[in-house]
Amino acid sequence: MDKNHTTFENLALLEENLSPSSFSLMLYENAFSKIKLIQEIVKKQTLPVLFVDLDFLFSGYVKSQMLAIPNLSLFNTVESTITGILPKVLTKISTEPHLIIFDSINGLYNTLSNNADSGRVVNSILMLLGQNSKFSNSILVTFALAGKKDNNWVLPNGRQILENENMKKFFISDRSKITIEK
């Protein structure tokens, strides 16, 4: 991972907004820049990290020991189901604040692809995590591979991304520039 010398323009902007009880959505174009950004976020945090990895890229880096992160609890759907992961995450944040990284909304849709109401379930899960992280003074960061269509952020499967007044949206360009979305 050290061979990727990605530096992020405006990283301080992101760091200023990752505060207790915050809910941030990171929209990205490049999965490897996303992993490097996660590494930057995590190394500056003092909170224990709960990482829900639904696209398995981060898990691969951790399992191969290319990334070593202290205080990391890693969850993925290879080892459990989303319905098994959520109670564990909620229990952990009920006892102490954590940095919760939920990667990614795309992976959650894929996990729930057989559910006719997957859109509602995805939104409900995100709202549940958002509210519980707020009550526990945790920091919730979710990721989504997305692009703009008609001034709205949409996932590659065409679904529009949840809008929430409590959520801060950031865009990580392919050139690793971080901008805040209004």
For every predicted segment, state its role.
Residues 1-19:
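Pre-Walker A adenine-sensing motif
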Residues 19-88:
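Conserved P-loop
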Residues 20-23, 45-46, 69-72, 96-97, ...:
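Short, well-ordered alpha-helix to beta-strand connector turns
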Residues 25, 99-103, 141:
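Structural motif
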Residues 56-58, 79-80, 106-108, 146-149:
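Conserved nucleotide-binding/hydrolysis micro-motifs of P-loop NTPases
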Residues 61-63, 111-113, 151-154:
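Short, well-ordered secondary-structure micro-motifs
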Residues 77-136:
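Phosphate-binding/switch loop-helix module in NTP-utilizing enzymes
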Residues 132-182:
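Phosphate-binding/switch region of NTP-binding enzymes
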